[in-house]
Swiss-Prot record:
Residues 22-88, 106-172, 193-261, 278-348, 365-435, 452-521 form the S1 motif domain. The gene is rpsA. Keywords: Repeat, Ribonucleoprotein, Ribosomal protein, RNA-binding. NCBIfam families: PRK06299.1-2, PRK06299.1-4, rpsA. This is Small ribosomal subunit protein bS1. Pfam families: S1. InterPro entries: NA-bd_OB-fold, Ribos_protein_bS1-like, Ribosomal_bS1, Ribosomal_protein_S1-like, S1_domain.
Amino acid sequence: MSMENFAQLLEESFTLQEMNPGEVITAEVVAIDQNFVTVNAGLKSESLIDVAEFKNAQGEIEVKVGDFVTVTIESVENGFGETKLSREKAKRAADWIALEEAMENGDILSGIINGKVKGGLTVMISSIRAFLPGSLVDVRPVKDTSHFEGKEIEFKVIKLDKKRNNVVVSRRAVLEATLGEERKALLENLQEGSVIKGIVKNITDYGAFVDLGGIDGLLHITDLAWRRVKHPSEVLEVGQEVEAKVLKFDQEKQRVSLGMKQLGEDPWSGLTRRYPQGTRLFGKVSNLTDYGAFVEIEQGIEGLVHVSEMDWTNKNVHPSKVVQLGDEVEVMILEIDEGRRRISLGMKQCQANPWEEFAANHNKGDKISGAVKSITDFGVFVGLPGGIDGLVHLSDLSWTESGEEAVRKYKKGEEVEAVVLAIDVEKERISLGIKQLEGDPFGNFISVNDKGSLVKGSVKSVDAKGAVIALSDEVEGYLPASEFAADRVEDLTTKLKEGDEVEAVIVTVDRKNRSIKLSVKAKDAKESREALNSVNAAANANAGTTSLGDLLKAKLSGEQE
């Protein structure tokens, strides 16, 4: 080996010793292909770097042949004369230096919001990913940050830890610095009643915050429009420019209340004059609830059709079964309360009242027919014209049977006849009777056999305490054992059996409970009195010729014969 070659090798050896991993050097781009960028850093050999390290966010190669770039040494020449270089690490090193200088000097940097993480957002500042806490996104808390994603926004670096690869930035710091002067000017000129423009920056369930330029104003949901607004997002969207009136301004607390609906005339003014009670008009269903439907009768004016005012007969139906959102319906003004901004509307009032129609076409005592709609513990409902029902109470099913027994004979869907007993249009009630189709056997019987009458019947059933006497096919009387004879009877079964004929006097009539009490003892006493009266009359007629004893014997003998 010549001395010249040895000197060259020695110089290269010294040069390599000075190039350590992690050092940043300059290299020239000498070739670019599909997979690699070839650079010459003045080393023994050229180096290949992955082409991906030279592409921007759009996937475009940022360099061309002849450009000089900074690269970082990852490893020095190995036994094959190769040195591994990295463009990416060099860029990151430069970006870290820029971040450190920006933090030290308080400079403002730009970055792109590229993701959402727990507690905040991630920001790409060149090749460094930083963290933006949710509390530092704005000068006020921001509930929805989705509109920031993908946007380039300015920040300040407030925390830096290169070892842990941790960078924290603040957008709030930038806003507070830049909005200070704007806020001061705005606060000096802001007045209640003035009209101001702003940008919607955040939407919540209860309203929206509007950036007025240095200070935020609250636009409450109730001040968005005169009509009902379910959610502010129906009217507003983030980033939208709006015009509003300053309703209230607290300079000390720097709070501003805004209103959009106040820019227009209150549609409730003079509403009762425009729509007198009983007015019929058409409106559009704007909202449905469990208790009714809201109908917009003009722009910004809604009224409630309560579920009970939707249909004459279907009172428990869900409003969605009757109308749908957007339906045009005819309604009647029932009541307007301008003070409370409430309107009561009715839909059924625009239709014929089936109760009034029934009352106009039927009178008390009329016979009707209909199908059994339902059977309850208190009676039978019968379907009537117009989709309404009439009630046959248990007590009006049968003259002779109890209501509980009589109701078992009826089935749902069965056609029945009944008599109209009463019509109450106001309460929407119609009383019917089935037993009234026939005469009252009990009433007919006691009309000719009242208290004190002598009646005959047969024993239907008997026990120790008394007997049930069939006085006719449909009327019964009760004979207590104590009323069988003047002498005490301990067990009436020793005196009577089923089928025996009995003659007795009616001693009690209970029309309310429809019961008759009988007495054989009273019948015997009555006959004895009549016999005595007859004897006395004969004695008076034959005074002086015949003794009382003879007359009584004669009377008794005649009765026995």
